[in-house]
Amino acid sequence: MVPFSPETPLSGVGHILQPDEYLWYRRSVTLPEGFFRGGRLLLHFGAVDQCCTVWVNGQEAGSHTGGYLPFALDVTELIEGDAFTLELRVTDPTDTGSLSRGKQRLKNTGIWYTPQSGIWQTVWMECVPENYLRSLRITPKPEENAVHIRLEADDPAMAAVTICRDGGIIAEGQTDENGESTLTIPAEELRLWSPEEPFLYDVAITLAGGDKVESYFGMRAFGIGKDEKGCRGCC
Protein backbone atom coordinates (compact mmCIF):
# COMPACT_ATOMS: atom_id res chain seq x y z
CA MET A 1 0.00 0.00 0.00
CA VAL A 2 1.36 3.42 -0.97
CA PRO A 3 1.01 6.10 1.76
CA PHE A 4 -0.56 9.47 1.07
CA SER A 5 1.88 12.21 0.13
CA PRO A 6 2.87 14.36 3.14
CA GLU A 7 1.13 17.43 1.71
CA THR A 8 -2.33 15.80 1.92
CA PRO A 9 -4.53 15.98 5.05
CA LEU A 10 -5.11 12.21 4.92
CA SER A 11 -1.39 11.60 5.45
CA GLY A 12 -1.64 13.06 8.95
CA VAL A 13 1.45 15.15 8.19
CA GLY A 14 0.11 18.16 6.30
CA HIS A 15 3.54 19.54 5.44
CA ILE A 16 4.75 20.89 2.08
CA LEU A 17 8.16 19.38 1.40
CA GLN A 18 10.74 22.13 0.93
CA PRO A 19 13.63 21.95 -1.57
CA ASP A 20 16.21 21.53 1.23
CA GLU A 21 14.27 18.77 3.05
CA TYR A 22 14.35 14.97 2.76
CA LEU A 23 11.33 12.69 2.75
CA TRP A 24 12.11 9.17 4.05
CA TYR A 25 10.21 5.90 3.68
CA ARG A 26 11.15 2.68 5.45
CA ARG A 27 9.43 -0.67 5.79
CA SER A 28 10.11 -4.37 6.18
CA VAL A 29 9.01 -6.61 3.30
CA THR A 30 8.39 -10.36 3.31
CA LEU A 31 7.96 -12.06 -0.05
CA PRO A 32 5.27 -14.73 -0.43
CA GLU A 33 6.51 -18.28 -0.06
CA GLY A 34 7.84 -19.58 -3.38
CA PHE A 35 7.76 -16.13 -5.01
CA PHE A 36 11.42 -16.19 -6.06
CA ARG A 37 12.11 -19.26 -8.19
CA GLY A 38 15.42 -18.19 -9.69
CA GLY A 39 16.18 -15.58 -12.32
CA ARG A 40 16.09 -11.91 -11.32
CA LEU A 41 14.12 -9.88 -8.77
CA LEU A 42 12.91 -6.49 -9.96
CA LEU A 43 11.61 -3.73 -7.70
CA HIS A 44 9.18 -1.49 -9.62
CA PHE A 45 8.04 2.05 -8.82
CA GLY A 46 5.12 3.47 -10.81
CA ALA A 47 6.29 7.03 -10.06
CA VAL A 48 8.09 8.98 -7.33
CA ASP A 49 7.96 12.77 -7.23
CA GLN A 50 10.70 13.97 -7.81
CA CYS A 51 14.24 12.64 -7.12
CA CYS A 52 14.84 9.48 -5.09
CA THR A 53 17.49 7.03 -3.92
CA VAL A 54 16.61 3.46 -2.92
CA TRP A 55 18.35 1.19 -0.40
CA VAL A 56 17.71 -2.53 0.13
CA ASN A 57 19.08 -4.03 3.35
CA GLY A 58 21.22 -0.94 3.82
CA GLN A 59 22.83 -1.16 0.37
CA GLU A 60 22.12 1.38 -2.34
CA ALA A 61 20.05 -0.21 -5.11
CA GLY A 62 19.81 2.80 -7.41
CA SER A 63 18.32 6.23 -7.94
CA HIS A 64 15.89 7.98 -10.27
CA THR A 65 15.06 11.53 -11.30
CA GLY A 66 11.67 12.59 -12.66
CA GLY A 67 8.29 12.41 -10.98
CA TYR A 68 6.11 11.14 -13.81
CA LEU A 69 7.82 8.03 -15.22
CA PRO A 70 8.04 4.44 -13.91
CA PHE A 71 11.37 2.78 -13.18
CA ALA A 72 12.66 -0.59 -12.01
CA LEU A 73 15.73 -1.73 -10.07
CA ASP A 74 17.35 -5.17 -10.14
CA VAL A 75 17.71 -6.07 -6.45
CA THR A 76 18.54 -9.76 -6.83
CA GLU A 77 22.01 -9.53 -5.31
CA LEU A 78 20.79 -7.43 -2.36
CA ILE A 79 18.22 -9.89 -0.99
CA GLU A 80 18.90 -13.13 0.86
CA GLY A 81 15.90 -15.21 1.76
CA ASP A 82 12.33 -13.92 1.66
CA ALA A 83 12.61 -10.84 3.92
CA PHE A 84 14.34 -7.51 3.41
CA THR A 85 14.27 -3.86 4.48
CA LEU A 86 13.37 -1.20 1.93
CA GLU A 87 14.33 2.47 2.37
CA LEU A 88 13.64 5.40 0.09
CA ARG A 89 14.87 9.00 0.28
CA VAL A 90 13.05 11.66 -1.73
CA THR A 91 13.76 15.29 -2.56
CA ASP A 92 11.41 17.60 -4.46
CA PRO A 93 12.53 21.04 -5.66
CA THR A 94 9.04 21.78 -7.07
CA ASP A 95 9.23 25.12 -8.91
CA THR A 96 12.76 25.97 -7.68
CA GLY A 97 14.26 23.37 -10.04
CA SER A 98 14.24 22.65 -13.76
CA LEU A 99 12.30 19.36 -13.72
CA SER A 100 8.76 18.92 -15.05
CA ARG A 101 6.25 19.79 -12.31
CA GLY A 102 2.94 20.57 -14.01
CA LYS A 103 0.90 23.07 -11.96
CA GLN A 104 2.84 22.53 -8.74
CA ARG A 105 4.19 25.60 -6.94
CA LEU A 106 5.48 26.13 -3.42
CA LYS A 107 3.47 29.36 -3.24
CA ASN A 108 0.25 29.11 -5.22
CA THR A 109 -1.18 32.27 -6.74
CA GLY A 110 -4.53 32.16 -8.49
CA ILE A 111 -4.88 28.38 -8.38
CA TRP A 112 -5.82 25.96 -5.58
CA TYR A 113 -3.32 23.21 -6.28
CA THR A 114 -1.15 21.74 -3.53
CA PRO A 115 2.32 20.42 -4.43
CA GLN A 116 2.73 16.66 -4.06
CA SER A 117 5.91 14.80 -3.14
CA GLY A 118 7.10 11.22 -2.77
CA ILE A 119 5.63 7.91 -3.89
CA TRP A 120 2.34 8.43 -5.70
CA GLN A 121 2.07 5.30 -7.87
CA THR A 122 2.13 1.57 -7.14
CA VAL A 123 5.25 -0.21 -5.85
CA TRP A 124 5.63 -3.92 -6.59
CA MET A 125 8.09 -6.81 -6.95
CA GLU A 126 8.48 -8.98 -10.04
CA CYS A 127 10.34 -12.24 -10.59
CA VAL A 128 11.66 -12.59 -14.16
CA PRO A 129 13.97 -15.00 -16.03
CA GLU A 130 17.67 -14.21 -16.42
CA ASN A 131 16.96 -13.09 -19.99
CA TYR A 132 13.88 -10.89 -19.74
CA LEU A 133 12.25 -8.26 -21.92
CA ARG A 134 13.21 -4.78 -20.68
CA SER A 135 11.35 -2.72 -23.24
CA LEU A 136 9.31 -3.11 -26.40
CA ARG A 137 8.70 -0.62 -29.19
CA ILE A 138 6.08 -1.29 -31.87
CA THR A 139 6.09 0.95 -34.96
CA PRO A 140 3.20 0.47 -37.41
CA LYS A 141 3.97 1.06 -41.10
CA PRO A 142 0.56 1.01 -42.79
CA GLU A 143 1.96 2.34 -46.08
CA GLU A 144 4.05 -0.86 -46.28
CA ASN A 145 1.46 -3.24 -44.80
CA ALA A 146 4.05 -3.92 -42.10
CA VAL A 147 4.92 -3.44 -38.45
CA HIS A 148 8.42 -3.02 -36.99
CA ILE A 149 9.28 -4.60 -33.64
CA ARG A 150 12.24 -3.55 -31.52
CA LEU A 151 12.97 -5.00 -28.09
CA GLU A 152 15.66 -4.73 -25.43
CA ALA A 153 17.01 -7.71 -23.49
CA ASP A 154 20.38 -9.20 -22.55
CA ASP A 155 19.94 -11.60 -25.48
CA PRO A 156 17.34 -10.13 -27.86
CA ALA A 157 18.10 -12.43 -30.81
CA MET A 158 15.79 -15.20 -32.03
CA ALA A 159 12.77 -13.96 -30.08
CA ALA A 160 9.52 -15.32 -31.53
CA VAL A 161 7.04 -12.64 -32.64
CA THR A 162 3.40 -13.50 -33.30
CA ILE A 163 0.68 -11.13 -34.51
CA CYS A 164 -2.97 -12.11 -34.19
CA ARG A 165 -6.27 -10.74 -35.42
CA ASP A 166 -9.52 -11.90 -33.82
CA GLY A 167 -7.65 -14.77 -32.15
CA GLY A 168 -6.02 -16.09 -35.33
CA ILE A 169 -2.33 -15.84 -36.23
CA ILE A 170 -1.76 -13.64 -39.29
CA ALA A 171 2.02 -13.05 -39.13
CA GLU A 172 5.03 -14.67 -37.46
CA GLY A 173 8.73 -13.89 -37.35
CA GLN A 174 11.93 -13.73 -35.30
CA THR A 175 14.13 -10.89 -34.13
CA ASP A 176 17.69 -10.46 -35.38
CA GLU A 177 20.79 -10.04 -33.22
CA ASN A 178 19.76 -6.43 -32.53
CA GLY A 179 16.31 -7.43 -31.31
CA GLU A 180 14.51 -6.11 -34.40
CA SER A 181 11.99 -7.66 -36.77
CA THR A 182 9.68 -6.35 -39.49
CA LEU A 183 6.55 -8.40 -40.15
CA THR A 184 4.24 -8.03 -43.12
CA ILE A 185 0.48 -7.95 -42.55
CA PRO A 186 -1.38 -9.77 -45.36
CA ALA A 187 -3.42 -7.31 -47.43
CA GLU A 188 -6.66 -9.13 -46.66
CA GLU A 189 -5.93 -8.81 -42.92
CA LEU A 190 -5.02 -5.12 -42.97
CA ARG A 191 -7.40 -2.95 -40.98
CA LEU A 192 -6.51 0.62 -40.10
CA TRP A 193 -7.12 2.17 -36.69
CA SER A 194 -9.38 5.22 -36.48
CA PRO A 195 -11.29 7.00 -33.71
CA GLU A 196 -14.51 5.66 -35.24
CA GLU A 197 -13.14 2.09 -35.49
CA PRO A 198 -10.25 1.71 -33.00
CA PHE A 199 -9.22 -1.76 -34.14
CA LEU A 200 -6.19 -3.30 -32.40
CA TYR A 201 -3.95 -6.24 -33.30
CA ASP A 202 -2.56 -8.53 -30.60
CA VAL A 203 1.17 -9.25 -30.48
CA ALA A 204 3.15 -11.76 -28.40
CA ILE A 205 6.94 -11.77 -27.88
CA THR A 206 8.69 -14.87 -26.53
CA LEU A 207 12.40 -14.65 -25.71
CA ALA A 208 14.88 -17.48 -25.74
CA GLY A 209 14.75 -18.54 -22.09
CA GLY A 210 10.99 -18.34 -21.74
CA ASP A 211 10.07 -14.73 -20.93
CA LYS A 212 6.86 -13.80 -22.75
CA VAL A 213 5.13 -10.45 -23.12
CA GLU A 214 1.77 -9.74 -24.75
CA SER A 215 0.77 -6.33 -26.08
CA TYR A 216 -1.28 -4.71 -28.87
CA PHE A 217 -1.06 -2.02 -31.53
CA GLY A 218 -3.15 -0.14 -34.06
CA MET A 219 -2.21 0.33 -37.73
CA ARG A 220 -2.04 4.08 -38.13
CA ALA A 221 0.70 6.60 -38.94
CA PHE A 222 0.88 10.28 -37.99
CA GLY A 223 3.16 12.99 -39.32
CA ILE A 224 3.55 16.61 -40.37
CA GLY A 225 2.88 17.47 -44.01
CA LYS A 226 1.09 19.76 -46.43
CA ASP A 227 -2.59 19.45 -47.24
CA GLU A 228 -4.18 20.00 -50.66
CA LYS A 229 -3.91 23.78 -50.12
CA GLY A 230 -0.20 23.60 -49.27
CA CYS A 231 -0.68 24.32 -45.57
CA ARG A 232 1.44 22.34 -43.12
CA GLY A 233 -0.33 20.38 -40.42
CA CYS A 234 -0.81 17.00 -38.80
CA CYS A 235 -1.71 14.20 -41.18
Mark where each language-model region is:
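Beta-strand-rich binding/interaction modules
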Residues: 54-56, 145-175, 181-183
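Short, aromatic- and glycine-rich surface loops/edge beta-strands on solvent-exposed regions
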Residues: 85-88, 197-208
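Extracellular Ig-like/FN3 beta-sandwich strand-entry sites
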Residues: 38, 81-83, 156-158, 196-200
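Accessory beta-strand-rich segments of carbohydrate-active enzymes
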Residues: 15, 19-132
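N-terminal carbohydrate-binding accessory modules
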Residues: 136-137, 204-235
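Surface beta-strand/loop "capping" patches
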Residues: 127-156, 233
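A structural microfeature
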Residues: 62, 171, 211-213
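Exposed aromatic-hydrophobic patches
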Residues: 70-77, 180-189
